[in-house]
Regions:
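Autoinhibitory propeptides
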Residues: 1-15, 35-102
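Short glycine-/aliphatic-rich beta-strand segments at the starts of folded cytosolic domains
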Residues: 15-30
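Substrate-binding/access-modulating region of protease and related hydrolase catalytic domains
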Residues: 27, 185-236
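Short, polar loop motifs at secondary-structure junctions
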Residues: 33-34, 63-64, 118-122
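Structured segments of extracytoplasmic/periplasmic soluble domains
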Residues: 73, 159-163, 203-207
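Short, acidic/turn-prone active-site loops that include or flank metal/cofactor-
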Residues: 83-85, 137-144
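Short, charged, surface-exposed secondary-structure boundary motifs
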Residues: 88-93, 142-148
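Subtilisin-like serine protease catalytic core
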Residues: 102-115, 119-135, 143-195, 211-214
């Protein structure tokens, strides 16, 4: 039992000891056999939210007693909370200081950009004369169409790819002909789970050859340092 407690993140260990939460959304790092672990989670009446194979992670929702049982399983390497990341602040005063020389002639024709953000509204500058929002995946509300209930993602996509038609070319993005592949991993309050971000990254990397994705925009930050979680990003 002592060795199994070493598999627990200190913050999660504290919460389990205090019994302050009924269900926990957690990240489970496994050695092998993710299907077997997923089966165990379901047998404990837990919910497997997603599996991120690139970094050997299962995201699940479990009760405290079930987490303790799962720790005894040899293929479970480490368990921590699925913490929130937040979108970076963006203001008009900051954005207005950006100047791009017209001599650079960057258009991005034939190139795609991945964006992990709060979504993207199908603004005229991104959809006319043809729609350049090629992919939209909603990990928050599972809606099938592009939208943005925060605004941050639309602003980000506009800076990257807006063609300026709605403003008579006054407000034009860096590369106004690139195609956008957007994963909505952040909610209307600008918060997103690490598991959703890692899943989005994994998917965009997998798609990169097919869609010629050369850049992935990650406009978010962590409120505190967690070595384990940061190593997961490195493993991708």
């Amino acid at each position: 039992m002592f060795s199994s407690t070493k598999k627990l993140d200190p913050n999660l260990k504290f919460l389990l000891a205090s019994s302050s939460i009924k269900d926990y959304r957690i990240l489970i790092q496994y050695r092998n056999f993710p299907d077997s672990i997923s089966k165990k989670i379901r047998s404990y009446h837990g919910n497997v939210i997603r599996i991120i194979e690139s970094c050997n992670i299962i995201c699940a929702q479990l009760k405290a007693s079930s987490i303790q049982l799962l720790l005894e399983y040899p293929e479970v390497k480490y368990i921590c909370l699925d913490q929130y990341f937040t979108l970076c602040g963006m203001s008009i005063s900051t954005a207005n200081k950006i100047r791009l020389s017209s001599k650079l002639a960057i258009y991005g024709r034939g190139v795609s950009v991945g964006v992990i953000d709060s979504g993207v509204y199908p603004h005229r500058d991104l959809t006319y004369p043809f729609n350049r929002i090629n992919t939209f995946v909603d990990l928050i509300n599972d809606l099938p169409y592009p939208y943005d209930d925060n605004g941050h993602g639309t602003c980000t996509c506009g800076i990257i790819a807006g063609n300026g038609l709605a403003s008579n070319k006054i407000y034009t993005g860096v590369a106004p002909e690139v195609t956008i592949h957007c994963f909505k991993a952040f909610d209307k309050l600008g918060k997103g789970y690490v598991s959703d971000i890692l899943f989005s990254l994994e998917e965009l990397i997998t798609m990169s050859d097919k869609y010629n994705i050369k850049v992935i925009c990650l406009p978010f930050e962590s409120l505190y340092y967690n070595k384990f979680i940061f190593t997961l990003f490195d493993s991708l």
